[in-house]
């Protein structure tokens, strides 16, 4: 997980275009058979992508979150901008097809992503923020 620190508003107004891109642009987010995550100290948001092609991908907390599992103290929204896919949340299977979305509530432990067809893989765009209350997981069609 890449970690980005907050920038001072006084400093940002003097950044060049190249410096703005260096500090704020997220590149190469969608990579085959990987989950890529970028943690920003601005609002403690995590932006990411999961692109399962040949294998099922499991979402893990990593050392940066200092949590037992990714959504221990967070919630997550996702949208599938690729081919049809499957998201499994704590054993419950959701068929998340192209342009479908999901809200996954705080406390969800085991989350995996997979594609139905490797020749047209699912591409899950993810956003996660801190959560103080658990709400139920919802599939948005």
Specify the residue positions occupied by each region the protein language model found.
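Glycine- and acidic-residue-biased ligand/ion/polar-headgroup-sensing regions
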Residues: 40-56, 65-91
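Short acidic-glycine-tyrosine-enriched beta hairpin
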Residues: 90-106
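Intrinsically disordered, low-complexity, positively charged segments
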Residues: 4-63
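Short hydrophobic-aromatic micro-motifs
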Residues: 46-48, 102-104, 124-127
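Surface-exposed beta-loop interaction hotspot
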Residues: 113-141
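Short amphipathic beta-strand/extended segments with alternating polar/hydrophobic composition
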Residues: 58-61, 95-99, 139-140
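Short, charged beta-turn/beta-strand-edge "cap" motif at the junction between a beta-strand
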Residues: 108-111
């Amino acid at each position: 997980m890449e970690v980005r620190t907050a920038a001072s508003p006084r400093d940002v107004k003097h950044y060049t275009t190249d410096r703005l891109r260096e500090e704020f642009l997220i590149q190469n987010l969608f990579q085959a058979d990987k989950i890529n995550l970028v943690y920003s100290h601005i609002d403690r948001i995590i932006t990411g992508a999961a692109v399962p092609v040949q294998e099922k991908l499991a979402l893990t907390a990593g050392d940066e979150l200092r949590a037992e599992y990714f959504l221990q103290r967070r919630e997550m929204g996702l949208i599938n901008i690729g081919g049809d896919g499957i998201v499994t949340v704590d054993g419950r299977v959701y068929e998340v097809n192209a342009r479908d979305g999901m809200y996954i509530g705080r406390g969800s432990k085991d989350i995996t992503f997979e594609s139905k067809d490797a020749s047209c893989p699912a591409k899950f765009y993810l956003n996660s923020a801190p959560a103080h209350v658990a709400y139920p997981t919802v599939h948005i069609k």
